[in-house]
């Protein structure tokens, strides 16, 4: 009697990816670490100024109006609004580039690898939202509009925390954290477009498709000239802003329009820089430093400034249901949603955790995902209005919740730092000195 063939081995949960993907993630996180440090400095400066004797100067600067109305376009915005609507569009352009790259050439193109981060991101969004709703169910007066505030993850803040505590997070968890944050950003921009858009100007929205289509046509044909692409991008942003849809959506759509694959080079001609690496990667290399080093820190400076009012004011804010819902959503909801979803998915697929990891590692990583800063503050502004009393409670909740999540994550991850250092050494050994660590060669993951 013939023996029953054994089923093929299942890919373990949080298994190590390819060398090319690991190298790309490492480079992205290195840049985000620098941006995260600048972000923290900008947020700290805003908090100090907003709680100093010169606080009026900060709020006067934030509320200073610039712009005007030209050709029926309403572009008379405060500096805070310019940062939220304009500069964050650059951040979401990078998000769009990342998303397309992940779905076309990254881990998300493989359904078996994409299932876990997508499911974890959804779980990490649903549970914090439910906690916020439960806490604010009887608050009334539109409090539930902020349900999406504790659902976001700030990858720059998270990797800055990793840099500060000096831990070598294994490559599998680093890749998962970045992929989770990318999917998280997609869900966030979808929520903003669907739930925080009220009056839509159909004509302006239709007109926005024209410069967007021209931009897509240009980049598909390999056009790189800034004097062509920047005006088309600005026109798309202006018309999207006028349409009533949040202008940051324009950034994501522009990112989606950029091709990922390398373009064929005519015979006899050397490839352009973008053709050697792919247009999306070429754009990302140039736009990410602007996003991480300028756009996000400036937004954080104008968004994080809140007059706490001393210990009494802080205590009063923490007793408010909105603040409490945000803190609980970030600190408890995010890790519970991510870990629970991961456990359920691993049980359904009968996949075991990678041999080098433990579930406490997943808990620590999911606590990092509870650091919701940039997008959480943006959603708070949209939900309650910039400068409103509830917006002040949002800022305190996001800041305190993110710092608390970062602190817990640091404690959890530091307890495993010795194991992480061992894994890091294993992942960097290159005995044949060919530039590819041996663990990736044994897995035939050179590409």
Swiss-Prot record:
Gene Ontology MF terms = sodium:proton antiporter activity
Gene3D superfamilies reported in the protein's UniProt record: Na+/H+ antiporter like domain
Q: Which residues cross the membrane?
A: 34-54, 77-97, 115-135, 146-166, 176-196, 200-220, 290-310, 321-341, 359-379, 393-413
Q: What Gene Ontology terms describe where this protein resides (cellular component)?
A: plasma membrane
What is catalysed by this protein? Answer: Na(+)(in) + 2 H(+)(out) = Na(+)(out) + 2 H(+)(in)
**Membrane topology field:** Multi-pass membrane protein
- From the UniProt record, give one GO term of the biological process aspect: regulation of pH
Tell me the compartments it is located in. Cell membrane
Q: Which UniProt keywords apply?
A: Antiport, Cell membrane, Ion transport, Membrane, Sodium, Sodium transport, Transmembrane, Transmembrane helix, Transport
> Its function?
Na(+)/H(+) antiporter that extrudes sodium in exchange for external protons.
Name recorded for this polypeptide: Na(+)/H(+) antiporter NhaA 2
Q: Which gene encodes it?
A: nhaA2
